Amino acid sequence: MLLGDDGGLRPTIFAEMSALSVSTGAINLGQGFPDEDGPEEILEAARQAITDGFNQYPPGTGMPVLRNAISAHQQRFYGLTVDPDREVLVTAGATEGLAATILALTEPGDEVVTLEPFYDSYGAIVGLGGAKHVTVALRSPDFLPDGDELRAAITDRTRLILINNPHNPTGTVLSRETLELIVELATRHNALIVTDEVYEHLVFGAPHIPVATLPGARERTITISSAGKTFNTTGWKIGWVTAPPAILASILAVKQYLTFVNGAPFQPAIAVGLALPDSFFTGIAATLGRKRDLLSAGLVDAGFTVTKPQGGYFVVADAAPLGFSDAEEFCRVMPTVAGVVGVPISAFVRQGNRAEYASLVRFAYCKRESVLEDAVGRLGALRR
């Protein structure tokens, strides 16, 4: 995952597409970061924390004010009782939480099962730890996992089952039945479940279901989330892990040698964010849902086939109806032809499995509506 076919360091497709956006003046819908700041209450809390002197190393597990806020959040939204002192760890974003978890809980040769396509860090982290990466396909157009394929993939060799729900890049939200099957298989094969839930508040329709709330799951589930997507603070890199005490202690043992600690003035600010009223959380989902609908409709009008996402930041569109069977090639010409940047889904798929996703493109709708309207207008050039 880290090296190209020539053995050299491989630049990410995200870096390549962002560079194309700059060189062509195209609208960058390739990367999943918002273009608006989060709530003023959070920004002011960060400014105040800096003024108040929270500028040195915070505690290794995170500042108590944030750990308490995370615990209260889990109880408030999901009815989960989480000990802030023994079951909560603050990390440098969800990605560090994932890295510390995978490196702490796997040995070389262990198997880690993920859905595919997958967030690109998954494969890299699994590879760094020497584990074997096993995938279960999410196929177009519905991007739902097949139960029989889950049963075949999860075996006595499986150490971790890593699921991202809501799912990046497809926007799929896994059903309760699918999550219950995963818990059943984890229990049968004595595997741990790692859930990446960074889009937990960005679900359209049915409420988010944390795996840890399901019967029999709590004692074997490591839940990872972050503030960046919920509060438009992706640059602050404040994430967290919640897990049973013995498991969390193992994760902390690795995490302390990654970043050690991070983000002291941002931690109390995110604590403020987690305590915002329900209206804030329902409002951000409703606003993002409108943006999803705006971009999805524009992509359909431009000639793409679109799978409507159920959560998260992204929509997947098929460029085949426009005459492009190779999304990587399409994404390299689209900035010049249409003035918009997307990312090929093949960037989220292992080399040997890319043919099945060859014509699919991911677009981000976590932008200002005026930017999305401009992008939709530009995409009209593809019809001509």
Task: Report residues per predicted region.
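Active-site phosphate-binding strand-loop segment of PLP-dependent enzymes
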Residues: 134, 138-205
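N-terminal small-domain helix-loop-helix segment of the aminotransferase-like
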Residues: 2-93, 100, 149, 275-276, ...
